[in-house]
């Protein structure tokens, strides 16, 4: 650190120290708060020191700490920060004044605090003067500072507890909000996925629409090209038609020219016959005619080779016709020139007749002329053949022109057909474009319908989900109700089992008493029968045993036709009216058996009680009264009463004493028993099980 003089007052816009106390307690850490002005760049090399007020340089510090550099600073705003001085490095208590000074990395003091002291607290410092809030009283209340601080601490602790509870509540709310946010994020992810799928579908539809649009544009361009091609073909067809018409006109002209040439040739033949006298001139004329015929042959050959170039050939033919016309004109001129020669020949013949000498010469000349004439005739015949050949060639040319005309007409018809086919194809392509546009529109409509249905299905799924939750809640409540009912039924079952045990004990007691009474009565009757049988007869109507139904004993399985032994008769069989014991059925195995076996045991107990006598039934089932006994005894001991009375006493129907339901007499006895069991007994098994 460099030594530099210190200024007593901080520079304008320097570091500002906050909350500086006038005194600090020694051996306690001191916290220094300060604010850096806007535009100041804090550095880890800056430091804050505790200086004496009279210190003149930066090296006269008592202790210092490095300044803290904030993580993030906002441009144009002051920076608030703080540092702590440890208690072990602080000055000792005294009257010396100190102050905080901020020194930057260049060793320049950027700010200083007001002066303060380090001293021990005085006794009066521990007391605090309190004034009443309303200010109506002049009394000052002096209390220890510790009490005030303790009260403030308690209030702060209470406030902290309230804030902690509020924090817990807020954390719970934050947790709920986070769960809600997660649910919303999942829903958002689902919606985004659906949106992505819909976007992919839309992109696919857009791509297909773009492809269809491109195909439509291509087809439109092709249609334009085809239309232009059709127009070009129509122009070509029109041009070709004009050319064909021109060729036909030229062909007609050539035919007329050939006919004229033929007539002129015939005239020339006639003229050649007349020019037989002039052998030399005729020979020269024949030579010229041969040359012309040879030239015509060459022209015909050229015309045959130049058939494809019709326009040029026609022009050549026109030129040839003109040349032939010129030649014919020259021939006519020569024929006209032959007339004076004929006259000269006649004069020469006259001179020949007049001169004999000349006759011999003329004879020789005539012989040579005859030979020349023969040659001329042969050449004339040859020229006629050549003319006929030329005529044949001209006919062939006419046929060839007709064939070309037919071919042009066929090509024209083919071109027209191709044009019609192109038109049909263009119409089909237009219809296909319209159909594709309609399909695209339908796909858009269907996509919109799908989106609407998707939204509707989403809403319906949400409604179904809420309905499912509500139904689940109802099912849970119903399950709880059923469980409560099941518990009640179990309690009722336990009560009925307890009641059946009590009935069993009472039944055993009544059965033992009845058996003892029957044994005593039989002994007394046996003794009285031996002593005074007449007295027994007189008291027969008053005997309570005769009022009871015949006891159910072993004699029931005997002959049904035989009547039971009366009290006066000594029966060889011992009748035991004791019912079947119930205790073996309800002891031990009854706890392991099912509810159905328990119901069967209880039913057998009741039926045994009914068959044994009305008193036992009334003791066992006092709630049912005599109706159950009468009905039960009516269908259980009916055969015994029949045998005792000797007449049929079977009822036509059986009636349940509880619900008065009737059963046919011929129905199975177990049906009525099962029906009655349904009123008193139930199965302990659950009808169904909730998962």
Swiss-Prot record:
GO cellular component: cytoplasm; nucleus
Binding site for Zn(2+): 656, 659, 675, 679
Zinc finger regions, UBZ1-type: 653-679
Keywords noted in UniProt: Activator, Coiled coil, Cytoplasm, Metal-binding, Nucleus, Phosphoprotein, Transcription, Transcription regulation, Wnt signaling pathway, Zinc, Zinc-finger
Annotated region described as p300 KIX-binding, given as residue ranges: 1-30
Domain notes: The C-terminal activation region (AD) is used for downstream signaling. Seems to be essential for coactivator function with nuclear receptors and with the aryl hydrocarbon receptor.
Chain's role: Functions as a coactivator for aryl hydrocarbon and nuclear receptors (NR). Recruited to promoters through its contact with the N-terminal basic helix-loop-helix-Per-Arnt-Sim (PAS) domain of transcription factors or coactivators, such as NCOA2. During ER-activation acts synergistically in combination with other NCOA2-binding proteins, such as EP300, CREBBP and CARM1. Involved in the transcriptional activation of target genes in the Wnt/CTNNB1 pathway. Functions as a secondary coactivator in LEF1-mediated transcriptional activation via its interaction with CTNNB1.
Protein name: Calcium-binding and coiled-coil domain-containing protein 1
Encoding gene (name): CALCOCO1
């Amino acid at each position: 650190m460099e030594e530099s003089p210190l200024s007593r007052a901080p520079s304008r816009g320097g570091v500002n120290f906050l909350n500086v106390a006038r005194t600090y307690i020694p051996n306690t850490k001191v916290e220094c708060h300060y604010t850096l002005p806007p535009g100041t760049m804090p550095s880890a090399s800056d430091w804050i020191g505790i200086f004496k007020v009279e210190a003149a340089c930066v090296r006269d510090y008592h202790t210092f700490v490095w300044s803290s550099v904030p993580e993030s600073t906002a441009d144009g705003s002051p920076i608030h920060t703080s540092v702590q001085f440890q208690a072990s490095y602080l000055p000792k208590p005294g009257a010396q004044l100190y102050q905080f000074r901020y020194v930057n990395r260049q060793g320049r003091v950027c700010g200083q605090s007001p002066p303060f002291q380090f001293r021990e607290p005085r006794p009066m410092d521990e007391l605090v003067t309190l004034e009443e809030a309303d200010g109506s009283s002049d009394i000052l209340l002096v209390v220890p500072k510790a009490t005030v601080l303790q009260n403030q601490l308690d209030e702060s602790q209470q406030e902290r507890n309230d804030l902690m509870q509020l924090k817990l509540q807020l954390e719970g709310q934050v947790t709920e909000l986070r769960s809600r946010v997660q649910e919303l994020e999942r829903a958002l992810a689902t919606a985004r996925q659906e949106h992505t799928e819909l976007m992919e579908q839309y992109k696919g539809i857009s791509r297909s629409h773009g492809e269809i649009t491109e195909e439509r544009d291509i087809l439109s361009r092709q249609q334009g090209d085809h239309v232009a091609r059709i127009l070009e073909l129509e122009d070509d067809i029109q041009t070709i038609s004009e050319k064909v018409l021109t060729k036909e006109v030229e062909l007609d002209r050539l035919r007329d020219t050939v006919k004229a040439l033929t007539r002129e040739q015939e005239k020339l033949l006639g003229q050649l016959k007349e020019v037989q006298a002039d052998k030399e001139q005729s020979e020269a004329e024949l030579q010229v005619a041969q040359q012309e015929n040879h030239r015509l042959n060459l022209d015909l050959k050229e015309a045959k080779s130049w058939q494809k170039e019709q326009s040029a050939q026609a022009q050549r033919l026109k030129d040839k016709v003109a040349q032939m016309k010129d030649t014919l004109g020259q021939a006519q001129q020569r024929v006209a020139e032959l007339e004076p020669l004929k006259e000269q020949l006649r004069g020469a013949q006259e001179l020949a007749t007049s001169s004999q000498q000349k006759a011999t010469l003329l004879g020789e000349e005539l012989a040579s002329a005859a030979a020349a004439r023969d040659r001329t005739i042969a050449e004339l015949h040859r020229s006629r053949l050549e003319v006929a050949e030329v005529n044949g060639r001209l006919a062939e040319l006419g046929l060839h022109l007709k064939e070309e005309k037919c071919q042009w007409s066929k090509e024209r018809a083919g071109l027209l057909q191709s044009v019609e086919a192109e038109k049909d194809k263009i119409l089909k392509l237009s219809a296909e474009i319209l159909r594709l546009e309609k399909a695209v529109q339908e796909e858009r409509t269907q996509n919109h319908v799908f989106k609407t249905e998707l939204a509707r299905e989403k809403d319906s799924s949400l409604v179904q989900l809420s309905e499912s939750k509500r139904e689940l809640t109802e099912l849970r409540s119903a399950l709880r109700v059923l469980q409560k009912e099941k518990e009640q039924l179990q309690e009722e079952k336990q009560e009925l089992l307890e009641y059946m045990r009590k009935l069993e004990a009472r039944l055993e007691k009544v059965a033992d008493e009845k058996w003892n009474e029957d044994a005593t009565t039989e002994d007394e009757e046996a003794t009285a029968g031996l002593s005074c049988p007449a007295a027994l007869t007189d008291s027969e109507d008053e005997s309570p045993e005769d009022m009871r139904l015949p006891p159910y004993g072993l004699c029931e399985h005997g002959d049904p036709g035989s009547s039971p032994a009366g009290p006066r008769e000594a029966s060889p069989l011992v009748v035991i009216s004791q019912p079947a014991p119930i205790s073996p059925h309800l002891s031990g195995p009854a706890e392991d058996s099912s509810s159905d076996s328990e119901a069967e045991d209880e039913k057998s107990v009741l039926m045994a009680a009914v068959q044994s006598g009305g008193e036992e039934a009334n003791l066992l089932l006092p709630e049912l009264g005599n109706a159950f006994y009468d009905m039960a005894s009516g269908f259980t001991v009916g055969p015994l009463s029949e045998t005792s009375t000797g007449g049929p006493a079977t009822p036509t129907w059986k009636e349940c004493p509880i619900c008065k339901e009737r059963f046919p007499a011929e129905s199975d006895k177990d049906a009525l028993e099962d029906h009655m069991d349904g009123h008193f007994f139930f199965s302990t098994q659950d009808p169904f099980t909730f998962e």
